Amino acid sequence: MKALLNKDIREEIQALIEIAEENLSAAKILFENKLYRDAVARAYYAIFHSAKALLLTKNLNPKKHAGVIKMFGLYFVNEGYIEEIYGRIITKSYNLRWKADYTTDKPTEEEAESIIYEAEMFVDRIKKALKEIL
């Protein structure tokens, strides 16, 4: 089903996807330079911004991270439109980003590599969903 969205919302969705792609590119560069803490954060923000883009298709615009995660689960995963793995990815990435930003625990190379891979999967899945909706 195609969403009836005004031009401003469509432009905001496109801008969020561009931000997600930039964050994903930055995560890869940071990873290559062994800056795992920042790589994890950028990978999370790639997921976060792409999830926000999808939420806008339902005129939902939560301001907080927890709201994005909750609404993504309620309106897309629980409804069966997006596979459950993506609900797990957004939650896992949030928790890892929180650990990276607010504790002295440094993410491992494996954690950073895994979350970047999952962020790429997530962004690709959201872009596919947006093509179907828009």
Curated annotation (Swiss-Prot):
Putative toxin component of a putative type VII toxin-antitoxin (TA) system. Its cognate antitoxin might be MJ0604. This is Putative toxin MJ0605. Keywords: Toxin-antitoxin system. InterPro entries: HEPN_dom (IPR007842), UPF0332_toxin (IPR052226). The keyword Protein biosynthesis does not apply. Signal peptide: none annotated. Belongs to the UPF0332 family.
